[in-house]
Every structure is written in C-alpha cells, then in structure tokens.
C-alpha cells in the first residue's frame, strides 16, 4: 500500500504541537490517519531495530522518509548522511531528529554533484529506501553498492505485503 506524501501537513502539525516526542504523541492522538501513523510512529523502527550495527560507523541513508529510521541509525552509528530528492522530507526528518548532532542532510542534487572520490567506498552501511518504481532495480543496487566500503552492508527497505526483512552484504 503506497502512502500519500504528507510532508507539508506534518510540518504544519509540528508547528501546532511541536516536533519533540511529546509533540509527536499529541499529533498521533489528534490525527489517526494511516499516513500520519506511517510518518511519525516509532513502531516503524521495528524495520531495523533487530539489526546489529556494530562496526557501522559511517552510514548513508538514501531516501529520507520522515525520519523514524534516521533516529534509530543516529542512536546506534557514529555518523548518518541522509540524502533525499524532496527538500520537505529532509526538513521533516531534521525537525524529528533535531537532538542528534551526528546527522547531516543532503539534497539529492547536491549529492550527485559530489566528486566520486567523496562518496564511493566511503560508507559502512547504505540504507536504501525504494519508493521510485520507475527506476531500474539493477541500476539502483549497483549505484548504492558503489558507496559501500569493502566490508559494508546494504539494507534495502521497501513496502511489501509479506513483511520480509532482508539484508545483503557486499560480495567480492
């Protein structure tokens, strides 16, 4: 089930209730739409909460979403670089994770302009969210894998009806 993007609505709700944990709880009490639950509920941490992030110091998250997963990564890893095509998603994420000083937010266009040596082979973990069905999956995986360090891991997170949890390691 594909959720509608409600970034601007979430930003309005943050203005009204706040973006801290207390404010988010108030938002969830006041607005029970599935889109709001999807965007703000910390239950979504279950997607990766079970994973061991030992040795995953430098993380690249491709696809910001609203920031629930970013918060989990920021708690467990040394640095998280979040890349998204939508500025408003980065703003929502940044407001949700304002307490973390180890997260940097990068617009996708700026990330693409970075020199290859600045990003290829630099990340211990790449978290790839795929909500762009128009892109070729082989191209997406090849590009994401190029950012991994030699022993890096790639996590591919997508909406799926069966709830599979898969993780891939870089193969030589």
What is each stretch, according to the model?
Residues 115-126:
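A short acidic, Gly/Pro-enriched loop at the edge of an enzyme's catalytic core
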Residues 66-77:
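Conserved SAM-binding loop of SAM-dependent methyltransferases across substrates and taxa
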Residues 38-57:
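Conserved alpha-helix/loop element of class I SAM-dependent methyltransferases that forms part
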């Amino acid at each position: 089930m594909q959720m509608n993007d409600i970034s601007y609505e979430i930003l309005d709700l943050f203005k009204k209730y706040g973006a801290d944990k207390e404010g988010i709880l108030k938002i969830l009490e006041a607005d029970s739409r599935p889109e709001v639950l999807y965007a703000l509920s910390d239950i979504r941490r279950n997607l990766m909460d079970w994973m061991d992030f030992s040795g995953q110091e430098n993380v690249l998250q491709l696809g910001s979403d609203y920031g629930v997963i970013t918060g989990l990564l920021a708690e467990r890893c040394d640095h998280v670089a979040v890349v998204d095509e939508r500025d408003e998603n980065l703003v929502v994420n940044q407001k949700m994770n304002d307490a973390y000083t180890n997260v940097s937010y990068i617009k996708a266009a700026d990330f693409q302009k970075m020199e290859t040596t600045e990003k290829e082979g630099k990340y211990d973990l790449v978290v790839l969210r795929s909500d762009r069905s128009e892109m070729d999956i082989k191209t997406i995986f090849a590009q994401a894998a190029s950012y991994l360090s030699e022993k890096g891991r790639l996590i591919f997170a997508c909406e799926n009806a069966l709830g599979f949890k898969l993780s891939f390691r870089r193969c030589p």
